[in-house]
Amino acid sequence: MTNAAEIKVLSTQATEEAYRELVPQFEKATGHKVTTVFTGTLGAQKRLADGESYDMIIMAGPAIDAQIKAGKAVADSRVDIAKSGVAVGVPTGAPKPDISTTEALKKTLLAAKSIGYS
């Protein structure tokens, strides 16, 4: 394809599984080559702040909004492409925490010995 382009993408890791499935299909259909850097949100923000440039960035909505405000992304190019759920997991045999209300969730989090998140 004579009009094929190389498209540079910066993406946070939340979309990686679906992305790795879809990009080869896109490349085959269009002839374009997609080069992607996957990183966490803070890593992506640092790369952009350090002046790295990309044709497309894929991040959570608030992070994209921050890039728009910083002049690193064009406001009318923002498109929501996915919804993300949040889950709680506990070790096998541990009691299930009460997260049925905002107050119960707050109490559970404050009582936790440790919390891991990504």
Task: List the model feature ranges, each with a label.
Residues T2-G116:
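N-terminal segment of the mature folded domain
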